[in-house]
Amino acid sequence: MFGRVPRSNNTKYYEVLGVPKTASKDELKKAYRKAAIKNHPDKGGDPEKFKELSQAYEVLTDPEKRDIYDQYGEDALKDGMGGGSDFHNPFDIFEQFFGGGAFGGSSSRVRRQRRGEDVAHTLKVSLEDVYNGSMKKLSLSRNILCPKCKGKGTKSEAPATCYGCHGVGMRNIMRQIGLGMIQHMQTVCPECRGSGEIISDRDKCTNCRASKVIQEKKVLEVHIEKGMQHGQKIVFQGEADEAPDTVTGDIVFILQVKVHPRFKRKYDDLFIERTISLTEALCGFQFILTHLDSRQLLIKANPGEIIKPGQHKAINDEGMPHHGRPFMKGRLFVEFNVEFPESGVLSRDQCRALEMILPPKPGHQLSDMDLDQCEETTMHDVNIEEEMRRKQYQRKQEAYDEDEEEDAPRVQCAQQ
């Protein structure tokens, strides 16, 4: 990053610590020690004042940063350090200075931890599983903190802080390349490769070889509750991969309900299709339906209860259980398809007999005069889907032929 840095306030940090601009490193330490204890939030101090003290101490005890601050002020440091985002945590500086028990016990501050990633798995289940409820055991591999070193990666109590980056993992390279010109680059610390820690070969944990984690196989019992939906999530909190200084993420199972050969589900209702004959549609029927829990349901219509093609009948409380209220269920809908007899099955006598039984034909009878004025037609059986495909192909072929005619060379008349 290049830019001309204007001069700004270069006395604020000295005033915050209450020292002159000529203060030595020992004087800075003494001033910080006194002010930090007084203003620590655990002692009722102002958190913003405590933060300012830490920033001032961090800048003025770093010779390179102090030189830039003395020449160009606070704004130059902010521009050169990515908007000031590279300051260390003020509590970290305090604990490095005093240790963890400055007030006779461990600090009440909990170090902010990043959250680990969740791990999602698709779990295929049957419609029977979500109707009856079921349990599945799944074996998974995951990383856990090494039990021998407790995730430190070392034999000793804790790894050493990297001297190259002071535990940050990144190094800021700042150079003055001209009058009022500063070059700033941020790179991964080559000493610790971004970890902020240094572990010697002799101090590496023999169990995890300083990786801090080991692999574990774990069996999870996944309970599919009655009435769960396609796409619903089952969450195992804190069961994903563990890592140091990280809040462990969750393992998430996403239900994928497989298509059933007979039943279809819509919310808490179930649908089935049933094909019946014309005789059954007119004179009644009965059949046995095996439900998702293997119960046998008797489905019937009494003689004279006419079933029309495409008609639906509902059976209460035989649909899906409500999730969370499994004793309440939706409805089971039966859609009826009526299969008519083939042409030629009925004789003329049978047709006349049916006419006597069935309701009369609607409308009036055509007279001989009406018939004489009409042209007689003949109807043929047709597969309408096949007919539409044939028509579509024919239209495409005609359009292709027209394009070829337009692209053909035209014959020019000879000039006289």
UniProtKB/Swiss-Prot annotation:
PROSITE patterns: DNAJ_1, DNAJ_2, ZF_CR
GO function terms (MF aspect): ATP binding; Hsp70 protein binding; protein-folding chaperone binding; unfolded protein binding; zinc ion binding
Domain J: 12-73
Zn finger spans (CR-type): 133-217
GO cellular component assignments: cytoplasm; cytosol; endoplasmic reticulum; nucleus
Amino-acid positions noted as binding Zn(2+) 1 in the UniProt annotation, renumbered to this chain: C146, C149, C205, C208
Positions of transmembrane segments: none
Pfam families (alphabetical): DnaJ, DnaJ_C, DnaJ_CXXCXGXG
Induction pattern: Induced by a compatible race of the rice blast fungus (Magnaporthe oryzae).
Residue ranges of CXXCXGXG motif repeats: 146-153, 162-169, 189-196
Binding site for Zn(2+) 2: C162, C165, C189, C192
GO BP: defense response; protein refolding; response to heat
Record localization: Nucleus; Cytoplasm
Region (Disordered): 380-416
Main location: nucleus
UniProt keywords, alphabetically: Cytoplasm, Host-virus interaction, Metal-binding, Nucleus, Plant defense, Repeat, Zinc, Zinc-finger
Compositionally biased tracts (Basic and acidic residues): 380-399
Keyword Nucleus: yes
UniProt similarity note: Belongs to the DnaJ family.
Oligomer status and interactors: Interacts with ZFP1.
Function, as annotated: Involved in disease resistance. Acts as a negative regulator of innate immunity to the rice blast fungus (Magnaporthe oryzae). Acts as a negative regulator of the pathogen-associated molecular pattern (PAMP)-triggered immunity (PTI) response through the inhibition of reactive oxygen species (ROS) accumulation and expression of defense-related genes. May function via the ubiquitin-proteasome degradation pathway.
General remark: Plants silencing DJA6 display enhanced resistance to the rice blast fungus (Magnaporthe oryzae) and accumulate increased levels of reactive oxygen species after elicitation with flagellin (flg22) or chitin oligomer.
Protein name per its UniProtKB record: Chaperone protein dnaJ A6
Organism name: Oryza sativa subsp. japonica
